[in-house]
């Protein structure tokens, strides 16, 4: 098992030694070196996702759709900037611009599923075309630059046609590349994944995606220094993973014995008709600790969103409920 030390003190990408002898792994590692924009990470991540589903041939369009789906939650839910802002206040990253454009076109929620996002992208295909095409200008070619150093021939970065031909020649005569490109133009341009690279990626999907996420988080944190716990904001967290169901069972036991009033409405919380949610929104504290979780009217949960509650009208009621929670668990061993 060969290890690639990423950024020396960072994530170690582990690839089976067999592939070290048959593929140019160092060139693969270079695919995320010196990015100018975040969508370089999402490009490789989308490719790995597609290959893990045994997709051998795709297009720029399909890859970019996957990129939008993968970045959607971070941008929409937490307003994360993928590559910072320009001096004039405009968004720098083309992928982020595509997401913001789709937001204006549709009523798709921040926590929409991948399938829902892909369906809406297709619905607004014409409107998104120009924004998506901007993402194809350099990254698909620059991502392979780490392999080009093996060739004495220099790449002509000024011509897509000549770059496509150059990539084909490198693949045929110098070293096998993860993908080559077809002759069509724009978003319809074909992407062909090499079978041996597909096998390597499928055998090492978890390690590779872990490495991509590590590099992505480093980049995003540098561009969003004010955002805490950014690693938890890349995708919606599964409620089972967060174990909120256990907290709900605890409150359910208390509701069988005592009256608990909703912090916001003052009305009694009824068994099986409430949600467990955070008093201080999860995006601020980045944890699901018991002190911050409370039962509340399920009809109000969505409108509460990620806004901080006003202190004076609500904290006293919240504190009284929390006191009841801890008092009840001490006095009733069955809860």
Language-model regions: role of each:
Residues 2-247, 312-329:
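Mixed-charge, low-complexity interaction segments
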Residues 21, 40, 255-258, 272-275, ...:
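Active-site-proximal structural scaffolding
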Residues 29-37, 252-255, 283-287:
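Short, charged/polar micro-motifs that form catalytic or ligand-binding hotspots
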Residues 31-32, 39-44, 279-282, 293-297:
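Long, contiguous hydrophobic alpha-helical segments, chiefly transmembrane helices and signal peptides
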Residues 52-55, 255, 270, 284, ...:
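Hydrophobic/aromatic-lined pockets within catalytic cores
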Residues 245-275, 297:
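Short cysteine-rich loop/turn motifs with clustered Cys
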Residues 264-295, 304-317:
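Histidine-centered nuclease catalytic patch
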Residues 293-306, 325-335:
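Short Fe-S-cluster ligation motifs
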